[in-house]
Amino acid sequence: MDTHEFHKLLIKVVDLFLEDRIKEFELKLNTTLDELEFEELIGKPDSSNSAENNGIFIDEYSYDASENAIKKLFVEYVRQPEFKYTVLSIKGVNDWVRE
């Protein structure tokens, strides 16, 4: 997935989230950021680790997937496009993006 495709996908995620069309989803990422850098960017890992929680997952860690977290990820990507995020999967309630 190139930079332009990922940019479009993030815009779609933010739009759907703000329109309240995504009730639950997973966003799995492979990133060059280490755990502490990602915590500073997105927030601390969700300690409950419940399958019912929305989440942004890196390795074993589940991060808050609130509106603010998604906006932060989007803003950081646009602000520093040299960070190469790879979307491994995004699942919405209507499977609008398939794995």
From Swiss-Prot:
Protein's name in the database: Uncharacterized protein ORF99
CDD domains on file: AcrID1 (cd22267)
Top-level lineage group: Viruses
InterPro entries per the UniProt record, alphabetical: SIFV_Orf14 (IPR009804)
TM regions (residue ranges): none
Gene3D superfamilies reported in the protein's UniProt record: 3.30.160.300
Organism (species): Acidianus filamentous virus 1 (isolate United States/Yellowstone) (AFV-1)
